[in-house]
Amino acid sequence: MSLEQVVVLLVAAAGAGWVDAVVGGGGLLQLPALMVAGIPPVQAMATNKLSSVFGTTTAAITYVRSTKLDRQVAIPAGALAVLSSGLGATAAVAISAEVLRPVVMVVLLGVAAFVTLRPAMGQVPKPHLRTNARVVAAVAVGGVGIAFYDGIMGPGTGTFLIIAFTTILGLDFVNASATAKIINIGTNVGALVVFGLQGHVLWTLGLGMAVCNIAGARLGARMALKRGASFVRVVLLIVVAAMVTRLAWQQFA
């Protein structure tokens, strides 16, 4: 691998850390960069998980120090996410990405329309929506459903978690993003363990990228905390549009 390719990967890792810390979707930058460098898809996914687990943990710590974390959801969902994502990573070899991409594209378009048509969504918390049944639903959706998807494919996991917690629990975007980071740690760890046992992780490269991912994540989390829910909403819509575009290109190009 050339020096230029290494520099591109490090820059992509920093950008991915920033995006992941704000709304998720950093894989949009990291995964293509890894594959353009000539790394096979499975190894690229595995190395992406290694880098991301450090950045996501950094973002989570930054959020926890400055905002309220929904521990009633984050802790059980995060624990379940380790198992669910691991199962997803195991199933990844049997499920074609071509089958999942159109479904994910439709869901992302629905998310974009939903957020666009509801400008007040996620701007302020709505605690009156919270019930025990909704807490259980949020844990199941985040810790099982979305986590399993992250193990199989991944794009949009953080975004899906934020939308789920905002819609189901009435959290604002900043608190939803903070809570999502804990589940994201679980999904990254679960998938990383499976990929590591299968020998797909490029450890030296992944750890080098992790340093830049940490820097980007720290900056992204601080910006989200400083600029608030409106900033997170704008970045979320931009990232969703970018994800739909990339998935469409992969599917139809």
Model-derived features: positions:
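Selective hydrophobic functional segments
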Residues: 46-106, 188-238
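Residues within membrane-spanning alpha-helices of integral membrane proteins
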Residues: 6, 49, 104-108, 112, ...
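Residue-level signature of the transmembrane alpha-helical core
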Residues: 10, 14, 18, 49, ...
